[in-house]
Amino acid sequence: MMTSMEGMMEMGVLDDIIRRLLEGKGGKQVQLSEVEIRQLCVNARQIFLSQPNLLELHAPIRICGDIHGQYQDLLRLFEYGGYPPSANYLFLGDYVDRGKQSLETICLLLAYKIRYPSKIFLLRGNHEDAKINRIYGFYDECKRRFNVRLWKIFTDCFNCLPVAALIDEKILCMHGGLSPELENLGQIREIQRPTEIPDNGLLCDLLWSDPDQKNEGWTDSDRGISCTFGADVVADFLDKNDLDLICRGHQVVEDGYEFFAKRRLVTIFSAPNYGGEFDNAGALLSVDQSLVCSFEILKPAPASSTNPLKKVPKMGKS
């Protein structure tokens, strides 16, 4: 495990990078230097490896699902939930691809991670994988705005991201879902980093699997990779591991959040009007100190609107 923090960026430099990135409202492109982005990747990589693969976090915390390069929507989420370090954040992965500003999105999140390493936490999504983001937009954005070398630096950083988080020993968070190989949380802690994402097995499933409304047990996924799992699988896993809730991203849901398995699993998706193709809302999940969950809904932004957010009543203890 790498714990050395040599060569970390100075706080003043980080604050300047964050300030410049936050000026990119209204669709304005923010062009950091290649040297600055390399430093962000290298420093963040050190921090990821110094923290566990199964993060152990505490409420209160705000949880965000997929962002997919929709930088303006990320800024809207921070406007509502509070900019770090005023609130604790956990992001469930899929920062890049499909949206227009993957670079701004991942650079702001990495900069915040380095600046406030105990206030903001980033999990790995299935798009934080060279095989996937080579195809779905991030590679092309890096190549167009910088070069392929920089994309490879990001790949080295992504290979060190943690894959799951446990909030107050009761809420388990990951990007995708459960795995037929997963019996206890110790197995997640044992996954070695840095690592690529394999085509099958525990790590693959944690980032790729989906809940299945129609079938019980385990079923092959229509995605052509990993599997789906029924409500019975969720109940069995939570009961055996003394957990209350699974929180995951990975799927577009119309209202930004969607419950499954008698509210024992929730899907969070934080990219409204995803890719300009879906009329979905985005959501931000707030977990208070009593583990009471509430949702803030981010409606697709009309061109003239600045912050169309709606608060949903509290949902009771998870």
From Swiss-Prot:
One GO term describing the cellular component: nucleus
Binding-site residues for Mn(2+) 1, renumbered to this chain: 66, 68, 94
Chemical reaction(s) catalysed: O-phospho-L-seryl-[protein] + H2O = L-seryl-[protein] + phosphate; O-phospho-L-threonyl-[protein] + H2O = L-threonyl-[protein] + phosphate
Cofactor: Mn(2+)
GO MF assignments: metal ion binding; protein serine/threonine phosphatase activity
GO BP: pollen tube growth; root hair cell tip growth
Protein's name in the database: Serine/threonine-protein phosphatase PP1 isozyme 9
Organism of origin: Arabidopsis thaliana
